[in-house]
Amino acid sequence: MKDMKYVAIREMNIGFRNPWAYSFMALFAVFMLSLLIIHTQGGVSGFSGTSGTMLNLALYLLPLMALMLGSFSLTGEKEEGNWELLSTYPLGTWPFLAGKYIGLSAVLLSIVAFGFGLSGSAGWLLGSGFDFLTYKQLLGFSIGLSLFYLGIAMLIGTLARNRWQALTIAVGVWFFTVIAWPSLLIAMLGMMPYLWIKPAITTLTFLNPAELTRLFTVVKLGGGSTLGPEYYKWMIWIRSPWGTPVFAGVMLVWIGAALAAAYGLWERGRGRG
Amino acid sequence: MTRSINKWALLALLVVLAMMHGSPARAEDELMGLQEIVDQANPGATLVLKPGTYQGPVVVNKPLTIRTEGEGNVELINRSQLPALSIDADGTTVAGLHITDGMVKETPTVLVRGHRAVLNGLYIRTGGDGIAVRDADEGLVTNTTIDWAAEGVRLADKGNGVDVFNGHRWRFMDNTIRDVHDGIYMENSDDTRVTGNRIERSRYGIHCMYTNRTVIERNEGSLNVTGAMVMTARQVSVIGNSFSKQSENVNSQGILLYDTHDSVLADNTVDGNRVGLYVELSTGNRLENNEVRYNFVGIQLLDSSSNSIAHNRFTGNVADAQARSSEDNRIIENYWDNFRGIDANGDGNSDISYAINPLFQELTKKRPAFQLFFQSPGMVFLEGLYQSDRDRWTTDAAPLMTPPMSENQIGDAEGRTLTGIAGLVLLGCTGTLFFWMRRRMS
């Protein structure tokens, strides 16, 4: 536990010294603000044009940020030889990975918090801000998305040998889960028998954190009816009091699984080394 | 014989007495059924009901005017399967009655079969249809409130607020209808005017089937499945209505036109619905000056042609428009807030057109499961790639650069302040964190 705390604080130290973190923060904050200014008419409440665009902006930026920061942090340890040094200490893999995850989450979430803080207060001052519930929902969405992708980032950082590899895999994962997802699914499922489509899409959605978080948020914002009659039960279910805890549960399982896989791989590497 | 003469004499006396008091035929006995009072009245007489509770059902088979003394204190209770009030005679007026008819049943609470009926200021609590009009013309329903009375009935099993079949030239003005199946349902009924009504939490607010020249003006609807549903109709005017918050149901719309022709849809406000304006299989309609805002989809056009869609304002919608097989419409000079045009000659219209990508519509028509990708970043990306047959897309030829109407609504400030404060707190926290980390480092 102490080790984990040590690693986490070390990670935060490195993270807040990292110029990448600040450039990501600037990028995120500037985009949030400019979207707010573009949509100055009225306010932002519920699932509307503005919150839809915000949602998509977060979907573009946050996974990429999380994947890059996370995987670079791990591969950096390998490349710079820090890991070899650390392995001489009595430091377990689990405290190391978990500490890394926690430290990186702190850095990433403060980036998100800064972006949201800026747009929330600026929107208020400009008189075209968010409705509080929508703001809360979008913030929750961004946090969830960051944590999900940070989990994947740990796995990528474990798999990749250096930063270049990490970058390649990170961009690949990002493109696959965020941009190419509908195209791929439409192409693949188009060949399947009609009745298989919905179960297949449902299963695959649970495997894609971007889609999962997006759909959860769209329904929570009151936009569930856009999903059409096919998903009526989902809509009811997500909006029930059980929706949020179960989503949090799925998230925990997901991140836990990613970290566990990273742990397994890391341990194997250690055994060989 | 003597008995009947006596009765007539008594009635005449009563009428004379009543006239001397300025109000004819009084209901003497509270426990008396209303039917007996009605039976005793002369055709054309005015009955003024004393405060109290009366027993239904009642059949009015001669022209009468039934009013109440004062306001809101005359209640007609019906516990039978029959309509609480049946109007079979022409030219009957009923005003001010509170009718409670809570039994769930097929029959309506008020059944109108006579022409020129006037129902004014009623308060109806129904377990069936509130007011049903059958083969009767030229009636009027005003200032009437219709509520659903029974508990635990599914929306689909409820009755309609007002249900008109084969009733022409009716007027429905300033009524309030809540929690029913369809607020005002009109079938095979021409030249009706529906104005100033308020309909909430029902399936369809105003529903026209096989009607001509219906006028739907200045009505308000919220939290219904669909505000105004105009199906298989001609020359309907839907003007100045406001429908909002109809987004809960997967089939929700603000205003729907289906198989509707040569109609006008103007100056309406549709706010926060699943689909603002939905037009399917309709031709020759004019959709103008509507305010379409904060809907998930602004306007949806399916298999519709020869419509004119102009000077509407689309703001804050998640998707401006979706269209499929709707090529020959005249779409011009609308304002779309998601579209950034170029206006080189300064006439206020964009020189580049705004084409509505049909990809998503076509995709989800074939496989509804893909509806899940609505406005997902990947879908937006894919739509950007898909550009084939662009000249056949539904296109606004010259979209407006600035909104045509003055902004009449800035969202409520409620909750904004809270967001501002939350934002400042977040900023403060991250600021402190950065500062603290920096200090630790140095």
State each model region's role.
Chain B
Residues T2-A9:
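Bacterial N-terminal signal peptides that target proteins for export
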Residues L11-M20:
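Bacterial N-terminal signal peptides
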Residues A25-G56:
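Acidic Gly/Asp/Thr-rich repetitive segments characteristic of extracellular carbohydrate-active
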Residues N42, N61-P63, A89-D90, V94, ...:
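Parallel beta-helix/beta-solenoid
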Residues N78-L85, M103-L111, T126-A132, R154-N166, ...:
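Extracellular beta-strand/beta-solenoid scaffold signature
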Residues N249-Q253, Y294-L302, N307-S442:
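Functionally critical loop-and-helix segments that line ligand-binding/catalytic clefts
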